[in-house]
Amino acid sequence: MNFRNLIASGSRLGKRFCATVFAPASATGIVEASVSSPAAANVVEASVSSPAAENGVRTSVAAPTVASRQRELYKKLSMLSVTGGTVAETLNQFIMEGITVRKDDLFRCAKTLRKFRRPQHAFEIFDWMEKRKMTFSVSDHAICLDLIGKTKGLEAAENYFNNLDPSAKNHQSTYGALMNCYCVELEEEKAKAHFEIMDELNFVNNSLPFNNMMSMYMRLSQPEKVPVLVDAMKQRGISPCGVTYSIWMQSCGSLNDLDGLEKIIDEMGKDSEAKTTWNTFSNLAAIYTKAGLYEKADSALKSMEEKMNPNNRDSHHFLMSLYAGISKGPEVYRVWESLKKARPEVNNLSYLVMLQAMSKLGDLDGIKKIFTEWESKCWAYDMRLANIAINTYLKGNMYEEAEKILDGAMKKSKGPFSKARQLLMIHLLENDKADLAMKHLEAAVSDSAENKDEWGWSSELVSLFFLHFEKAKDVDGAEDFCKILSNWKPLDSETMTFLIKTYAAAEKTSPDMRERLSQQQIEVSEEIQDLLKTVCP
């Protein structure tokens, strides 16, 4: 099949459904304190040189259970973003302590880190295993390829694919992993060409490659191409799966085609083999919510609850968010309690979703309660949660409470604090408290210099600062602000326009302004030309 003829013309969900890799390998690698490998030999040598060994003392460490070993290993690896260090250092330390590190433990940790959007650390686990000559199955290679695409880019993923042994390369899951990379990176032409190659190899025999393409087109804002792909699937005798139905429904939502949506629901009801999942009804609820059809959304959420595994964390997260979207506060709390009962060890992500739901509902008391509960239990401080609390308090005009959150966070974590400071500065500038905003600006610059805190200037914050300078006719302040901005990126046309407007408002001239614009290669717009007539005559 020629994919180029398949379509004649003309989210988060897209990324979620661009998954192409499957179950872990059956081969199990073990690294422990034994002389069976170079890595293990180094461990033995290190243990022999210890004081206890030199004194002839043989120490005995009780072997941890499989479950406790897995928990401890994942805990240490998941905290690396807070504690610093590398995956290799952590794993080597485990071995030095006499703890066996098994491939299935490592694989489970990598999968979990990947799931929670920590691809760099997940890839480092694979890299560590590869350097120790652990056996990789085809599906291991597929997951590794996916992680390389996420951490090192598409070219590196292609190189990894091309350099694989034929036995690992010429497999449906490996080709599918590269297909996923193309779709995630929105490389339409490469994705179509790769689809054709997979088709020639008889690898397009299920819904997965089609789902990847559909997800890509949704993210390319081309939802009209999704039904065409569904028809092509059916012509091949490939039945839509639950993921297919979800993306297809999402395309109808994007096109405001509620009639088409109802037809899909009817088809799903008649399709005895339709493997609808909780995801299917989650997307249906989201579409109805967007259309303002809250009763239908509520009905879809009830169907979602019937389909979901009561122990599934993700489904609870979606339920809380979607119930908040239709202003069903009591339902949000009910699902939250259900999650805590099913999964007593509530992680940061679950608290994050709950805080987002509280924020969406404008439930300030709920924000305070949930945030306080999280702070008392968390073992890895996550500024994303603090930022939600800060933003919600500011929306409620509770600046002092928001600032207390930042003060507490600075005592308990190393940041980054840039997002929190931006939220506070925007609020202060909007309420004519520029002096306090400037103090936060100075602190933000200091944080960035001392801790290399990444700083992404929002256009809203930049414009608010310049509006303040223009109103105050503060040319010196505007110039100093430009110097600060230039430390992160070259000044652009919009920024220079703000600066020149400040000069004009202050009725001051800048004889070298035209030269500055030329040196910085700023395109002179008509607006700038008019301003220069008075600022740089």
UniProtKB/Swiss-Prot annotation:
Residues 1-18 form a transit peptide. Gene3D superfamilies: Tetratricopeptide repeat domain. It comes from Arabidopsis thaliana (Mouse-ear cress). PPR repeats lie at residues 171-205, 206-240, 241-275, 277-307, 312-346, 347-377, 382-416. GO terms for cellular component: mitochondrion. It is found in: Mitochondrion. Keywords: Mitochondrion, Repeat, Transit peptide. Belongs to the PPR family. P subfamily. One of its GO terms (molecular function) is mRNA binding. InterPro entries: Pentatricopeptide_rpt, TPR-like_helical_dom_sf. It comes from the Eukaryota. Signal peptide: none annotated. This is Pentatricopeptide repeat-containing protein At1g02370, mitochondrial. It holds the Pfam family PPR. Transmembrane segments: none annotated. PROSITE patterns: PPR. The lineage of its organism: Eukaryota, Viridiplantae, Streptophyta, Embryophyta, Tracheophyta.
